[in-house]
Curated annotation (Swiss-Prot):
Residues 142-151 have a biased composition (Polar residues). The modification Phosphoserine is found at residue 284. The chain crosses the membrane at residues 254-274. Keywords: Glycoprotein, Heparan sulfate, Membrane, Phosphoprotein, Proteoglycan, Secreted, Signal, Transmembrane, Transmembrane helix. It comes from Cricetulus griseus (Chinese hamster). Glycans are attached at residues 37, 43, 45, 47, 205, 215. One of its GO terms (biological process) is positive regulation of extracellular exosome assembly. This is Syndecan-1. Residues 1-22 form the signal peptide. One of its GO terms (cellular component) is extracellular region. Interacts with CDCP1. Interacts (via C-terminus) with TIAM1 (via PDZ domain). Interacts with MDK. The gene is SDC1. Cell surface proteoglycan that contains both heparan sulfate and chondroitin sulfate and that links the cytoskeleton to the interstitial matrix. Regulates exosome biogenesis in concert with SDCBP and PDCD6IP. Able to induce its own expression in dental mesenchymal cells and also in the neighboring dental epithelial cells via an MSX1-mediated pathway.
Length: 309
């Protein structure tokens, strides 16, 4: 009697699954375009990355349906219990993925009611979504701890060990969390510690115009050190001698007199050169007739008769 009831239940389940499988495949798979060449199909995104995500999900669902069909088609299988059903659903999950801690595990009992198929689909799809969120959360946590290393390497002596988590930067994907009430004091103490480790005021590269009030000897050292470091070494004796010569009036008057004498000499030299050039031009290009040897008496030119043969 028990075996006959099992056979009737299996037959009813098989008849229920037959119309559902073609309906899901018809909804998920796009219609075939027989007029096109096949290159512009809707199954591809156009960027060369492959099929669209919905096609991948539909194939995974179809593989799940095949597993369920093979499981229910075995004639000698015992009645499915809660453990068998849980094992069937957990085997569908990809390798290496586990549901998060604290999340309820959904166990769907195989039943002939109309809501059985909906429960199976929910169980096969929800764990995958939650595991994807867990993977991204782990990656962001790793990034946060990696960026946190340089901050915790130099903690302040007054900061408690448990408060270093408030200084960790948040990853781009995580929302910004407000630090606790003690976080502000920790940041201020670290800033004060960094301010005390800064270089002194007198060690700057440029000449400083302002001096800050500090205790006694430190102020004198800070005011004297920049002048000694920034200026190159100079011979004090040579500098004093050159400044003394320029300050004397006799030396200044001699320099001015020498300049004037040089200017006059240059003017005289230029005038002499111009005079020589003028005399040379007059001698070479003279238009006057040459003087005669008889005292300059005028003589008529002799006529030359021409005879024509």
């Amino acid at each position: 009697m028990r075996r006959a009831a099992l056979w009737l239940w299996l037959c009813a389940l098989a008849l229920r699954l037959q119309p559902v499988l073609p309906q899901i495949m018809a909804v998920n798979v796009p219609p075939e375009d027989q007029d096109g060449s096949g290159d512009d199909s809707d199954n591809f995104s156009g960027s060369g990355t492959g099929a669209l995500p919905d096609i991948t999900l539909s194939r995974q669902t179809s593989s799940t349906l095949k597993d369920v069909w093979l499981l229910t088609a075995t004639p000698t299988a015992p009645e499915p219990t809660s453990r068998d059903t849980e094992a069937t659903f957990t085997s569908i999950l990809p390798a290496g993925e586990k549901p998060g801690e604290g999340e309820p595990v959904l166990i769907a009992e195989v039943d002939t009611s109309s809501t059985t198929w909906d429960k199976e689909l929910e169980v096969t799809t929800r764990p995958r979504e939650t595991t994807q969120l867990l993977v991204t959360h782990r990656v962001s946590t790793a990034r946060a701890t990696t960026a946190q290393a340089p901050v915790t390497s130099h903690p302040h002596r007054d900061v408690q060990p448990g408060l270093h988590e408030t200084l960790a930067p948040t990853a781009p994907g995580q929302p910004d969390h407000q630090p606790p009430s003690g976080g502000t004091s920790v940041i201020k103490e670290v800033a004060e510690d960094g301010a005390t480790n800064q270089l002194p005021t007198g060690e700057g590269s440029g000449e400083q115009d302002f001096t800050f009030e500090t205790s006694g000897e430190n102020t004198a050292v800070a005011a004297i050190e920049p002048d000694q470091r920034n200026q190159p070494p100079v011979d004090e004796g040579a500098t004093g001698a050159s400044q003394g010569l320029l300050d004397r009036k006799e030396v200044l008057g001699g320099v001015i007199a020498g300049g004037l004498v040089g200017l006059i000499f240059a003017v005289c030299l230029v005038g002499f050169m111009l005079y020589r050039m003028k005399k040379k031009d007059e001698g070479s290009y003279s238009l006057e007739e040459p003087k005669q040897a008889n005292g300059g008496a005028y003589q008529k030119p002799t006529k030359q008769e021409e005879f024509y043969a």
